[in-house]
Regions:
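Histidine-centered divalent metal-coordination motifs
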Residues: 37-39, 155
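A generic alpha-helix propensity feature with a strong bias for hydrophobic helices
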Residues: 28, 45, 68, 169-171, ...
């Protein structure tokens, strides 16, 4: 199993050191909530390298008309899982990546302070790949071993009405079924609850 080292970097991940980060508040030095996102750049296109460029601050926003609005945007995520399952890391887990935006969870605002962001290469309109679920499960296991993972939520849970990702094609039931591999955290967000409630209803009818 992969591990996260003392500096907050995942062993074996493709490492890129984004300039888009800052320090976590001292009280949030141990992040225990994971936020799941999806992203493609340009929208709907895979394996372009543009996501890496965005997080590194080197995106050519003139390369495609859909990128123009991203000019000057300074964002990052701790991790990015490509369609192949390859894991890229841009910010140490001990630092504050800029993935959540205006957000609130469990009565707290500014979710970047206390969360780890994981971007999955994908959209709201297509299923994710088997390799991505396998990589995500392994990554969550490493996060749990290092930080005692407490809960896993969607970007849409912490920014309802503003964000929709990782979207309806993300299989929360599948992730929930593998939860013992990463400490059986809570799945209390609305995105997960909708799918899990359907699972419960199927069991009740059986």
């Amino acid at each position: 199993m992969r591990r996260i080292d003392e500096d907050g970097w995942l062993e074996g991940a493709e490492r890129f050191e984004s300039p888009h980060y800052n320090e976590r508040p001292v009280s949030d030095a141990t992040p225990q909530t994971v936020v799941l996102h999806n992203i493609t750049l340009p929208p709907g296109r895979f394996a372009t390298g543009c996501v890496t460029d965005l997080f590194m601050g080197t995106l050519d926003t003139t390369a495609d008309p859909t990128l123009a609005d991203l000019k000057g945007l300074r964002v990052s995520s701790h991790f990015f899982i490509e369609r192949t399952g390859r894991i890229l890391q841009f910010v140490s887990c001990g630092k504050r990546a800029w993935h959540a935006g205006i957000s609130r969870w469990a009565g707290r605002e500014n979710c970047n302070d206390f969360t780890i962001g994981i971007e999955l290469e994908g959209t709201d309109f297509v299923p994710f790949e088997e390799a991505q679920y396998a990589a995500l499960t392994e990554l969550l296991g490493a996060i749990h071993e290092k930080y005692a993972l407490h809960d896993v939520v969607a970007h849409s849970d912490i920014a309802p009405g503003r964000k929709t990702d990782p979207g309806p094609h993300f299989d929360w039931v599948r992730l929930w079924r593998s939860r013992e591999a990463f400490g059986s955290p809570a799945f209390d967000g609305a995105a997960a609850r909708v799918q899990l409630s359907r699972l419960e209803q199927r069991f009740e009818r059986a």
